[in-house]
Amino acid sequence: MADDQNCAPELEKADPSGEDGVDAKPDRSSIISSILGKKKKNASACPVKTARDRVPTYLYRMDFEKMGKCIIINNKNFDKVTGMDVRNGTDKDAEALFKCFRSLGFDVVVYNDCSCAKMQDLLRKASEEDHSNSACFACVLLSHGEENLIYGKDGVTPIKDLTAHFRGDRCKTLLEKPKLFFIQACRGTELDDGVQADSGPINETDANPRYKIPVEADFLFAYSTVPGYYSWRNPGKGSWFVQALCSILDEHGKDLEIMQILTRVNDRVARHFESQCDDPCFNEKKQIPCMVSMLTKELYFGR
């Protein structure tokens, strides 16, 4: 029929076993179903193509004019009201990260001792910039922290509030591009005693005008430690995580995929670092970084 010619072809039949549901409480699920039901009545007869209808590509495009912007927020000094100590050694981290990301082709900007409002403002403005000619975006947060929180010089703010500016529905020029966040901060007060292990052997996309992707897609969060634990920093050398990250990026930043890079960072922090403190409660402790990836493709900085 003529009316069907402009409709995108439906490539996959609906599952006859039933409709998709949500993992929510019964009261929330019924509300969501009601909302979705209303939307269905008003929906166009033309099906919207989803990402699974496209020919898959497994590498992020990096052939843009620029690699992208890298913002480093380096919080060293804190207002007395926060009760937080000076983060000695963080300037070493900021300097090493500046050189490292610049060598990868990023336009790097460092901001020191930012308030919570300043951090929000910086990242909001960055998300409003035109990233059309950039391959990706990176941000490094160096500060004190708690689980899901990061300290500005004057208090704490949720990490989610900082990163949400770059969601797909808010920052359109970074849509389907990697948004990388590296976070050097404590995530709790637990200590990792480690466990003795036996030594062993060392072991271009086609245009498609109508499809949707999740707004939280294409994010990567690389945390210096796992939820609930301290993150260690040496006053003379910088934090363990940043030392390892910069070392691996210098060695393999242009030839390994990002998850391979971060896996090697995990290994280096786990094997090569151990705390040395006069206080026996804090002596001989270990640390393991943690990454949370919503990336949808492989990322190579050197391609």
From Swiss-Prot:
Activity regulation info: During activation, the N-terminal disordered prodomain is removed by cleavage. Concomitantly, double cleavage gives rise to a large Caspase-7 subunit p20 and a small Caspase-7 subunit p11. The two large and two small subunits then assemble to form the active CASP7 complex. Can be cleaved and activated by different caspases, depending on the context. Cleaved and activated by initiator caspases (CASP8 and/or CASP9), leading to execution phase of apoptosis. Cleavage and maturation by GZMB regulates granzyme-mediated programmed cell death. Cleavage and maturation by CASP1 regulates pyroptosis.
Keywords from the UniProt entry: Acetylation, Allosteric enzyme, Apoptosis, Cytoplasm, Hydrolase, Nucleus, Phosphoprotein, Protease, RNA-binding, Secreted, Thiol protease, Ubl conjugation, Zymogen
EC number(s) on file: 3.4.22.60
GO molecular function: aspartic-type endopeptidase activity; cysteine-type endopeptidase activity; RNA binding
Region: Exosite, residue numbers: 38-41
Primary location: cytoplasm
Biased composition (Basic and acidic residues): 10-27
Site feature location: Cleavage: 36-37, 45-48
Comment on protein domains: The exosite polybasic region mediates non-specific RNA-binding, acting as a bridge for RNA-binding target proteins, such as PARP1. The exosite is also required for interaction with non-RNA-binding proteins, such as Hsp90 co-chaperone PTGES3.
Family: Belongs to the peptidase C14A family.
Name of the protein this chain belongs to: Caspase-7
The organism of origin for this protein: Mesocricetus auratus
